[in-house]
């Protein structure tokens, strides 16, 4: 086991109930990696609407509590299990939404930030299948926004075989739509996006939207 220096305890946020005030700042012992695991020092994390739904008990009301929320984060590898070959101490990585999704169907129990512990903590221990290296040109903050919304948008665009010149419609201005807008524009598509907010549509235009529709007008 290779370990960079880390504190014996860590700070984290823990969802202890679905009631108001259920998200509590606390401390735990800093985890050590088992076989097949890495420990990252979390540098950035982002919030998706799913995280809000989880905290309210609307996503999985039977979820076992307490748990550490948030699926999307990035950080530096500071410890690796003895059998880990693809990652080393010092690597910059981001989390992966489905921790066990390789060649087989992902299982719900591997969902980061829900059934599996999330990244709203100083340190996170994750299976080596649950992290990806991030390129040098990308900041931790940028990488922390990608695992859920951006990958969803990318998957949809790839599945639809979008090409330059195609017309692509995005409904709303949530995370998936905003990432989809930028990816589709990078591929040369003509992007149409909807919202009930003129302010949000102005932002969409700044990001490259060709046509905007306020569906309340």
Predicted features and spans:
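Short glycine/threonine/proline-enriched tight-turn/helix- or strand-capping micro-motif at secondary-structure
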Residues: 20-29, 58
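Glycine-rich beta-strand-centered segment in the early N-terminal region that forms part
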Residues: 30-45, 58-100, 117, 135-138
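Cytochrome P450 core scaffold surrounding the K-helix E-X-X-R motif
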Residues: 50-55
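NAD(P)H dinucleotide-binding glycine-rich loop of Rossmann-like/cofactor-binding domains
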Residues: 96-171, 206
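Adenosine-nucleotide cofactor-binding segment
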Residues: 167-173, 185-217
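N-terminal Rossmann-fold NAD(P) dinucleotide-binding loop
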Residues: 177-178
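Conserved SAM-binding loop of SAM-dependent methyltransferases across substrates and taxa
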Residues: 182
């Amino acid at each position: 086991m290779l370990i960079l220096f880390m504190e014996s305890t860590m700070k984290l946020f823990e969802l202890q109930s679905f009631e108001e005030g259920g998200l509590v700042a606390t401390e735990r012992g800093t985890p050590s990696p088992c076989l097949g695991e890495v420990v990252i020092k979390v540098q950035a994390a982002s919030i998706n609407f799913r995280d809000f739904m989880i905290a309210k008990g609307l996503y999985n009301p039977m979820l076992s509590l307490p748990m550490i929320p948030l699926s999307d984060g990035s950080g530096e590898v500071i410890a690796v299990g003895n059998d880990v070959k693809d990652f080393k101490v010092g690597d910059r990585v981001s989390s992966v939404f489905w921790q066990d999704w390789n060649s087989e169907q992902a299982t719900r129990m591997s969902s980061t930030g829900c059934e599996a512990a999330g990244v709203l903590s100083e340190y996170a221990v994750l299976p080596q299948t649950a992290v990806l290296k991030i390129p040098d040109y990308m900041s931790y903050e940028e990488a922390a926004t990608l695992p859920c919304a951006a990958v969803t948008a990318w998957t949809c665009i790839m599945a639809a075989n979008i090409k330059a010149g195609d017309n692509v419609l995005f409904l709303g201005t949530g995370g998936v739509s905003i990432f989809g807008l930028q990816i589709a524009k990078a591929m040369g598509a003509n992007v149409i996006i909807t919202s009930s907010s003129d302010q949000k549509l102005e932002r969409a235009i700044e990001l490259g939207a060709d046509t905007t529709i306020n569906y309340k007008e």
